[in-house]
Amino acid sequence: ITTRLVGSEMCIRDRSRGEFLNGKIMAAYLGYDFVDAASVIRFDKAGNLEAEETNKLLSKKLSKSQHAVIPGFYGACADGTVKTFSRGGSDVTGSLVAKAIHADIYENWTDVSGFLVTDPRIVHNPEPIEAITYRELRELSYMGATVLHEDAIFPVRKEGIPINIRNTNSPEDKGTLIVESTCKKPKFTITGIAGKKGFCSINIEKSMMNSEIGFGRKVLQVFEDQGISFEHVPSGIDTMTVYVHQDEFEEKEQLSLIHISEPT
């Protein structure tokens, strides 16, 4: 039987085959069961993870195995169409598996010894972060810290499963422990610093802005009407700045600014 795949569907499936074959080889080498991620990681047609269905499939499948190898970063729709997570999606796969088997801890082995206080490409020899909360990690991951996929915390967080980021090349390092909360006094006042490119700022100034009820809502409504998501909105007494993604704003800049400048 030959199945013909065309366009992006073929590209997505092709991208997953290396991981699939690597999993097959690893399972054979270790003598473990091989579980194809396409059979247990469920996506909808739009490429969104179906978390509840995935958890059911994983729990049922893994309850029959003492040891198993599961390829990362891809899954499939109910009809077998292969879908993938975004870059680094194997972290999410590991988190989903940890939740399904009610693991005591999710060890994520990578090529660095956990998170650092700041980017080593900018700051020389930054200090490692020994422990960090899920919330702090979520902020750092979204703003550019790429050690762990930003969505990997959700499955394990609900179950209270800690994550330990470890270094494959330096297994003796303790890495970074990610938990719901920590009573340990941090070494530094600031947990970490990360940055993300590709934003632009719209600065708005108006006298007595702070006393005008609904002004901020009216401004943000303009962006919503144009289909532009905002990232951050710092404000002062007479000033307001809206940070948006540059690629979303460029084609709609003039129309957005016209609506913002219109008297209300």
List the predicted regions and their residue ranges.
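Generic beta-strand/beta-sheet core signal
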Residues: 35-37, 71-72, 109, 150, ...
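Ser/Thr-centric signal marking residues that sit
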Residues: 2-3, 84, 90-93, 110, ...
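Nucleotide/pyrophosphate-binding catalytic subdomain
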Residues: 7-9, 13-153
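A conserved regulatory-domain signal marking ACT and ACT-like small-molecule sensing domains
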Residues: 174-261
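Single conserved hydrophobic/aromatic residue that forms the stacking wall/gate
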Residues: 1-7, 12, 258-264
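A conserved active-site cap/scaffold subdomain adjacent to cofactor or substrate pockets
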Residues: 140-178, 193-208
